[in-house]
Amino acid sequence: SDPKIGDGCFGLPLDHIGSVSGLGCNRPVQNRPKK
């Protein structure tokens, strides 16, 4: 769970989910790690 792939911790758009909030900060809640 790298905080640079798609955790949304930094407000980055998760893979193709589209969540830009700190919801899955190192926590695969709804933004499960694609890799």
Swiss-Prot record:
Disulfide bond sites: 9-25
Tissue/organ expression: Expressed by the venom gland.
Localization annotation: Secreted
Principal location: secreted
GO BP term, pick one: regulation of blood pressure
UniProt GO molecular function: hormone activity; toxin activity
Keyword Glycosyltransferase applies: no
Keyword Secreted: yes
Keywords, comma-separated and alphabetical: Disulfide bond, Hypotensive agent, Secreted, Toxin, Vasoactive, Vasodilator
Gene Ontology CC annotations of this record: extracellular region
Note: Negative results: does not activate natriuretic peptide receptor-A (NPR1).
Record family assignment: Belongs to the natriuretic peptide family.
Primary role: Snake venom natriuretic peptide that exhibits vasoactive and probable hypotensive activity. Is only weakly active on natriuretic peptide receptor-C (NPR3).
The protein's name in its UniProt record: Natriuretic peptide TNP-b
Organism per entry: Oxyuranus scutellatus canni
